[in-house]
Design a protein with these regions (language model features):
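Conserved nucleotide-sensing/catalytic segment adjacent to the nucleotide-binding pocket
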Residues: 1-44
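Alpha-helix-centered segments that form part of catalytic cores
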Residues: 19-33, 100-118
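Generic beta-sheet signal
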Residues: 43-47, 65
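Conserved catalytic network of the ASCE P-loop NTPase/AAA+ motor domain
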Residues: 36-40, 58-64
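Conserved nucleotide-binding/hydrolysis micro-motifs of P-loop NTPases
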Residues: 51-53, 71-77, 134
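A glycine- and Lys/Arg-enriched "phosphate-lid" helix/loop adjacent to the NTP-binding pocket
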Residues: 64-112
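NTP-dependent small-molecule kinase module
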Residues: 111-149
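Short glycine-/polar-rich loops that comprise or flank the Walker A/P-loop
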Residues: 61-66, 123-125
């Protein structure tokens, strides 16, 4: 049975939202791999997305330095949502309590980010924490350094 918008975004705990969100479980990861394998390997291929879970990516790497996870701080994520409050976020407006729905979503995302961090650390994969004080140029420099570019 499908949930209505309040059941999905307002009335559930963010932890329950995280545990039941299928994309955070690697669903469709194999389709991403198929797409990436069709791309030319030169000069470089950068792949991003929350379906790229460290435990799924690591076995595909020749060396662990080929991958890095950019992990937003909760403050960065909030700033991005505030700056992009666009139709993309319109689904929260379809709830009876848009602010709570958005808060739940942000909390779920923060828990997911923490899970990614812990998994990457356990697997000895690189991460960069991204906060709202970091410039695009600084982030690009740090990514290039981490990837040895």
């Amino acid at each position: 049975m499908a949930m209505d918008m309040d059941q999905r975004w307002v009335n559930r705990l963010p932890a329950d939202m995280l545990e039941t969100f299928h994309w955070f479980r690697g669903e469709c990861f194999s389709l991403i791999v198929e797409d990436v394998l069709r791309l030319p390997s030169e000069p470089y291929v950068i792949v991003e997305g929350f379906r790229l879970l460290p435990h799924l990516v690591k076995p595909l790497l020749a060396v662990s330095s080929q991958a890095i996870w950019l992990l937003p701080t909760p403050e960065f994520r909030q700033a991005m949502v505030n700056s992009r409050r666009s139709p993309q976020w319109g689904f929260v407006e379809k709830t009876s309590d848009p602010e709570r729905a958005l808060g739940n979503l942000l909390e779920r995302d923060a828990m997911f980010t923490q899970r990614l961090y812990e998994e990457a650390q356990r697997l000895e994969l690189k991460t960069i924490e991204v906060d709202s004080t970091m410039t695009v140029d600084e982030l690009a420099r740090r990514v290039a350094e981490a990837l040895g570019l």
